[in-house]
Amino acid sequence: MTHCAPLIGDLHQRSPIFFAAALSRWARAACAALLPVLVAGCVTLTAEPRALLQQSDGTVQVQSLACARTVSLAAATRTTPRATGLDPATIRILTWNIHKQGDRGWQDDLQTFAADSDLLLLQETVLDGTLQQMIDAAGMRWVMASSFIYENIDTGVLTASRIEPVASCTQRIVEPLLRLPKSAVISWFPLRGEATTLAVVNVHAINFSLSLGAYRAQFDAVVDALSQHEGPIVFAGDLNTWTTNRIAVVDAAAHRLGLTEIAFTDDRRRLFFGHQLDHIYTRGLDVVASSAIAVTSSDHNPVMATLRLTR
């Protein structure tokens, strides 16, 4: 389906036009809004959720990766310890909303972050040739959940890694008001010498809605996809937690999965209406180091952590 309308950026992004409303009362009143318009054009929304996977030969395969099918595959991989995989003693992860690669300096920052990461979780990713070449040059493989296609280029969330996942699935949910989807990638990675796998969730959460229904449904779907996973989990991304009610939804999902949020002593995460939007939650992992890195190359500051498997 092709939807010809203004392509709307995230509510919190820098723009000459800002949404004006009493957002703390958002669920009680449908407030008039002015939205930051990026460009006008035609956005293609595929009938089925669209996933893109980089193959071992460098080609890109487009397919549907429904989580209902993939979860059983991931569970079947828990058999014997693997000789190859992520180092369970040192897992370096970074999550970053890259703002559609629209800010100066993103290439230099991404190159640095990719070199220092085992897992790179990107949101608002435009899968153009420049981005693909940079990830390839970093020696990483990737899988993407496409939210929509604009000017024949996919935009969505992308997980890049130094080790190929044993399984991945994608989820997509449509924003209630803007009708543009938000997406998630869930991947299961082998851990060297371990029988279990590490589940990694990369989420760009719904931003613009009058109620919490769709927002809660997005997190419920992720929880359901992880219901059979007994091993460690990383749950991260731009969760758009700009109200206390949204934070409560995320906390409830985290509680169901036994997740703990990583804290930051020097917290440089960007704020929107007094709340951080970018988070990393974990289960079965110890935090060795964590930080939020101040940048000018996006409207979000990347968040990183070094983790190790809990013994």
Task: Spell out what each predicted region is.
Residues H3, C42-T80, W188, D224-I233, ...:
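Metal-dependent phosphoester-hydrolase catalytic domains
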Residues L7-L11, S15-T90, L191:
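Acidic, histidine-bearing metal-coordination/catalytic regions of metal-dependent phosphoesterases
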Residues L52-T80, L119, Q123-T197, I293-A294:
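Structured beta-strand-rich core segments of catalytic domains in phosphoester-bond hydrolases
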Residues S64-C67, T90-W106, F148-I149, R172-R179, ...:
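Acidic/histidine-rich helix-loop elements
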Residues I91-I98, L110-Q133, S187, A199-V203, ...:
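Active-site beta-strand/loop signature of hydrolases that rely on acidic residues for catalysis
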Residues W96-H99, Q123-T125, A145-F148, S161-I163, ...:
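Active-site-proximal beta-strand/loop segments in catalytic clefts of secreted hydrolases
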Residues R192-G213:
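Metal-dependent phosphoester/phosphodiester hydrolase catalytic core
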Residues L212-D224:
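Alpha-helical scaffold elements lining the catalytic groove of polysaccharide deacetylases
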